[in-house]
Amino acid sequence: MNPPFSDKNHRCLTSPFASAEATQQGAHRFAPPPYFDGQRYHSINTWLKRKCGEKTIKLAIDGGFTCPNRDGTKGVGGCTFCSDNGSGEFASNIEDQIRLLSDKWPHARYLAYFQNHTNTYAPVAELRKKYEAVLANPKIEGLVIGTRPDCLPEDVLELLSEINRKHFLWLELGLQTIHEETARAIHRCYDLRVFDRAMEALRERGIKAVVHLILGLPGESREMMLDSVRYVSSKPELFGMKLHLLNIVKGSQMEYLYPDYQPFDSIDAYVRLVCDCLERIPPEVTIHRLTGDAPRSILISPPWSFNKRTILNGIHDRLHLLDSWQGKRCE
């Protein structure tokens, strides 16, 4: 499938929402393209529905992996924002998830999401066994694998290339920020050059890459966060982006920063920043997340972040108010 807005020379010049008639007359009427589903950004849900013809759902699973930033190889305790469970608080059994979802979406298609910790951090034989066991389920049509850019050795890349030739696949890379001072503060334990090499390696093999950024890390200004968005957006191989609202959660090292540090003082402040970010992301890049999603049982701050629908509605309303859209100000 050719990505929408694939003409990079013109992708940021006109609103993708303006009808031809409205553009000619200078009017302010909108005819959203079908793949936006009435949204002003290019959501992964819309992309998947166009590609697969049905609603496609990611099923979060725990592959039993750890992380080099936890086992002593690079560090212990993980990144400072990470809880004991990594990023996969909602992971559960595949069949249980399908059973719960099938009544509401009887024709849905499913991707298995290896989410917790670093899901390429194991001997390649072990990785093959785990990936193939999941793909053996006839209801699973592909994989989504969360990992670190420094955990993609050559033999793992070859395995991923093999899977990519036979099944649907994308990798999710936890970058969080491009700023080295912040990276050291959050104990990320790799530098930006490692990320650049990983993106190039995935591009060479035709493997889709989704990059995670965190908004609200201590010490980062609005402009620093926008710099991270611009840098990642400049990667020609970028398939998608996740913008995470920093959640301070129980069990993380950041827990001890609260209440002296809070990521944002209001929903409105966060919504404004997300809209600024979306304007700088090319419109063909798929958007996989625009907020945080920590369970209430472990969330410390910000207390409003579990109100996901209010945040997303706020983003939609502000983009509409500004007559703006994803990619309007991309460079």
Where are these regions (language model features)?
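Acidic (Asp/Glu)-rich catalytic clusters
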Residues: 101-105, 131-138, 160-168, 200-204
